[in-house]
Amino acid sequence: MSGRVPWLDGARGIAIILVVLFHAGMFTVPTGLASPWWEPLNLVFALLRMPLFFLVAGMLAVGAVQRSWPALWRTRLAVLVWVFLVWTVLRFAYYQVVPEPIDLNQSSWTDFVLSVVRPSNGLWFLFALALFLVAAKALHGRVNRWVALAIATVASSVAHGGFTFGNVTYDGIMKYFVFFMLGLYLREPIIRFVHRRRWPATVALLVVFAAAIVLRGATGWFVDAATAVPVGLIAVAFGLCLSRNLARTPFTRLLSRPLEYLGRRTLQVYVTHILLLSTFTSVLMPFADTAVLTMLRPVMPVLMTATVIPVSLLIAAGCERVPVLRLLYAAPTWSSRERAGAALP
């Protein structure tokens, strides 16, 4: 199936909501604004949110990696590199002025200088995605796809088994490259698989995913390593089937359309939401023990997520009206053929 597949945008919408929810918990639990059980709950979705994001990115990159290097730069890489650099500077400048509500080490000059080769903040996804596109282009037509997938699977298993570089970016590259390549190489079989799965199969995938998470939690590192990719694929299959069924079922289309809208604007949310979460957390922290906020602790990450996503979109829409601010989310015309940047590639 060629052309745009709307439910893939819906899947990206699901993924970005889970990413924001994870970061909302990351800010609100340590500061006493949210219930502690949000930390293990967010860990449950670890094998869904980023694998889903990267697999869909791979599915949408099939045409891009077949283009020439200059075309790949203009249509995909330029916006990733530009936005990564711009927001790295913005985040560093922000945390030079505003204290961090939690210790993310975002104001370190050493980390800032090294960020072009060793990012250590939430923008690592952009760095990794650009690297994945370069790697996929370099491998295209030169390395057998099954060999590439086998190597990427082993790397992911090793990383999920406990191996670490001590850096979120390098660890993420090891863990998630396999999902990007699976999306890239198996786009059509994945689409056919999803199109044949209705609601009963979607629910069954959720049950299998939940059972697998419980079993993994009761085992050691070897089982964690060996099952990471298979369980991640079950989770991704659930996310894709959920998005597809929401889109094709009449009474759930009201949910799928906002998800698809959001999925086409993931870049704006991804780069903006952390600063908003940080700001809102800092504002609320002095009142963490008040009666109202104590009552809201069980749902605070959800409330934060429901707030920062639309605010991120509003900020981006406002910036779109001002030429110089438009460059916060799009590469300058001299570096890119497209003024792309609405959605992560």
Please tell me what each predicted stretch does.
Residues 50-63, 125-137, 163-194, 228-250, ...:
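Specific transmembrane alpha-helix
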